[in-house]
Amino acid sequence: MNETKEKVKFSVVLPIYNVEKYLNRCIDSVVNQTYRNLEIILVDDGSPDGCPAMCDYWAEVDNRIKVVHKKNAGLGEARNSGLDIATGDYIGFFDSDDYIDKKLFEEVYNIVTSKNPDLIEFGHYDVNKDGIVVKTFVPQIESTVFEGEEVMS
């Protein structure tokens, strides 16, 4: 990835509550993106398990990571807490039991620099506890690129 491409900064907000089993895989998938200019915001929503310590560990090993520890107030409030401190040109939200393809933000960069969208919708796979894909959602690219007036109608 060349230096010019690294100029666009993406903030990634991960609200975290009681997902100790999945958290390292989630954070690892964000930290190891091929596109590096990321601000990663881990919002510990008062998680009662080992997640708070895991968040602090990740912040120690990667300086792109910021951690917010707060009293449990639910998913929406956790996302808003991350949004409050985000400094990126674009902001992405993922659930903390998700993991993403290592080239996701490289592809997002290509979309935002060629189409300048206000919103991007991602496809996803639902996997069971054994890692087997049980459902696929892939948005049709043509149907997800709208002009502002189309979105409001």
What is the role of each PLM region?
Residues 1-153:
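Nucleotide-sugar donor-binding/catalytic module of glycosyltransferases
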